[in-house]
């Protein structure tokens, strides 16, 4: 099969689960003998642009005509069987869907977050769940400055969502939802249920697994409010006030709360902030852990770090909402705490560190869960099945003499 992957890579200065998923899927497909091409833009390149060039980026977020022309020309030249769209913000735009329609190539799209119904994609505002923009014109997001706390920065995203919603919903043959929890939200928002398929992200089998009880608790991810970083700090201070749990907390990552985390960890024996790990360091750190901590306050659409822990035979202590409640079976493959409650998180951390036998049992069950649902073999099967469904759907339309463009769902700009 010939696949063209379309992705706007996130900035390399901060960890990106999406970049990792894209790279892993491309490698998996190639190893299985499929031909895979890439059509990419990199957010890192924005920094090197002139001031007018940087200002122009926001104007092209809703629609980039140059990208449409470039991608359509490549599709006509290479004739892939299917296009797999990931992130299109900020340099690609939904114009990639028009390019697919122009060239008559079916498109599938992985929905890594909630940007189809929420401009910043988090379904969260001020640390609490928010669905004001779901199924509506996203004016509340602009009013509250939901993207990076800025109204001007939110406007391009809100405009893109409003003007391109129909284009997304009609121009993609198959949407890959990365959890059933995410799919439920999107169906309630009005997205076409028949084209929303659950396809969990897979994780490569790590080269190192936990062999003992673990020597630390690990937070691995973006240092941001939505990831529960402040909640974790509050829970850890509560534990420290009671004498601690006997193992240190290791925090690895980067993000807007980095300065706050650095100051909080300074001079403490029970906390280590280690900065941004590379991939190999991440795997080794996970394998040394009693548990991986994932206390997100927003409704995670998936939770890659939880599955990476499962692969290493390490349980997770995670917030009991969103995809985490789907990935982690409480008391079987890990522990779930009440979302947003520091005391509940502290209780779970205390429990898993106080009972090594429980930790070992949860870790073994987590590894079995990984093998059954998140291995590369399972991931490849689901990915290729999704492609075949999309190709068959487009072929059926062609045989029936009907296409989305012919029904007026395409774009003529």
Each PLM stretch: what is its role?
Residues 344, 351, 358-373, 379-385:
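A short, well-ordered alpha-helix in the C-terminal region of glycosyltransferases
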């Amino acid at each position: 099969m010939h696949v063209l992957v379309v992705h706007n890579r996130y900035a390399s200065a901060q960890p990106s689960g999406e970049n990792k998923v894209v790279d892993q899927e491309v490698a998996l497909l190639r190893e299985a003998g499929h031909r895979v091409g890439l059509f990419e833009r990199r957010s890192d390149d924005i920094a090197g642009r002139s001031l007018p060039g940087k200002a122009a980026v926001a104007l092209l977020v809703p629609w980039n005509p140059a990208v449409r022309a470039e991608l359509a020309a490549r599709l006509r030249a290479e004739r892939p069987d299917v296009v797999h769209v990931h992130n299109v913000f900020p340099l690609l735009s939904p114009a990639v869907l028009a390019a697919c329609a122009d060239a008559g190539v079916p498109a599938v799209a992985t929905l890594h977050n909630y940007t189809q119904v929420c401009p910043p994609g988090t379904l969260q505002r001020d640390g609490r769940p928010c669905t004001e923009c779901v199924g509506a014109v996203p004016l509340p997001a602009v009013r509250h400055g939901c993207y990076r706390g800025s109204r001007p920065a939110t406007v391009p995203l809100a405009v893109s969502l409003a003007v391109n919603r129909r284009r997304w919903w009609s121009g993609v043959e198959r949407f890959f939802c990365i959890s059933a929890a995410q799919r439920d939200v999107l169906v309630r928002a009005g997205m076409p249920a028949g084209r929303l398929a659950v396809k969990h992200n897979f994780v490569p089998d790590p080269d190192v697994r936990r062999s003992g009880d673990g020597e630390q608790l690990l937070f691995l991810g973006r240092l941001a409010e939505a990831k529960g970083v402040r909640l974790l700090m509050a829970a850890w201070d509560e534990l420290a006030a009671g004498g601690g749990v006997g193992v240190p907390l290791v925090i690895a990552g980067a993000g807007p709360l980095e300065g706050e985390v650095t100051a909080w960890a300074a001079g403490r024996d029970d906390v280590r902030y280690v900065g941004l790990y590379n991939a190999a360091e991440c795997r080794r750190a996970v394998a040394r852990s009693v548990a991986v901590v994932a206390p997100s306050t927003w409704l995670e659409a998936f939770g890659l770090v939880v599955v990476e822990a499962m692969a290493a035979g390490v349980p997770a202590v995670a917030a009991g909402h969103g995809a985490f409640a789907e990935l982690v079976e409480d008391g079987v493959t890990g522990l779930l705490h009440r979302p947003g409650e520091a005391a509940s998180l502290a209780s779970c951390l205390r429990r898993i560190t106080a009972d090594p036998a429980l930790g070992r049992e949860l870790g073994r069950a987590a590894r079995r869960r990984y093998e059954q649902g998140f291995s590369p073999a399972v991931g490849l099967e689901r990915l290729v099945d999704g492609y075949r469904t999309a190709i068959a759907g487009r072929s059926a339309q062609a045989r029936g003499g009907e296409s989305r463009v012919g029904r007026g769902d395409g774009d003529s700009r």
